[in-house]
Amino acid sequence: SINISGTDISKFSDTELDKFRGDNIGIVFQKPHFISSLTINENLKLAKYLSPSKTSGDAKKILESLNIKDKYQQKPNQLSEGEKQRASIALALINSPNLILADEPTSSLDDFNCDNVIKLLKKQAKDHKAQLIVITHDARLKKHFKNNLNL
């Protein structure tokens, strides 16, 4: 069986898995995924709309902590790669997930934004009692985590 947040998801239908993931799992993909015709704000609103049972975070506050609050009304193609990566992190965190999966969350980020992103991910995990799993090749992250698994 596969248990996440005390729920066995191994027998869920595809629809149930989609709903569960939207409510409980925040995913930071290595390459950001957005609906390109929507602004960052609209992408965040859509994520909140698709998971109405969950308490959502404040989009502007999350974007501010990622230093991209001023990009709120821009479309993804108007952002730099680093800004897209940070907006992708906001998208993963907007529904206050119980599990945060971050695949190369600091790719395309400078040192300053790398530190901010890791602090935000760890704070979000602590504040919402969420599990945080980070997959990375980025040596800058090693100092931020006590538990490391090197393969």
Which residues are covered by each model-predicted region?
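Conserved ABC ATPase "signature" region
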Residues: 8, 56-71
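ABC-type ATPase nucleotide-binding domains, specifically the catalytic core motifs of the NBD
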Residues: 38, 42-56, 65
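Conserved ABC ATPase signature
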Residues: 75-79, 83
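Hydrophobic anchor residue at the start of the ABC signature
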Residues: 89
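A short, proline-enriched helix->beta-strand linker immediately N-terminal to the Walker B motif
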Residues: 94-98
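Catalytic Walker B motif of ABC-type/P-loop ATPase nucleotide-binding domains
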Residues: 100-103
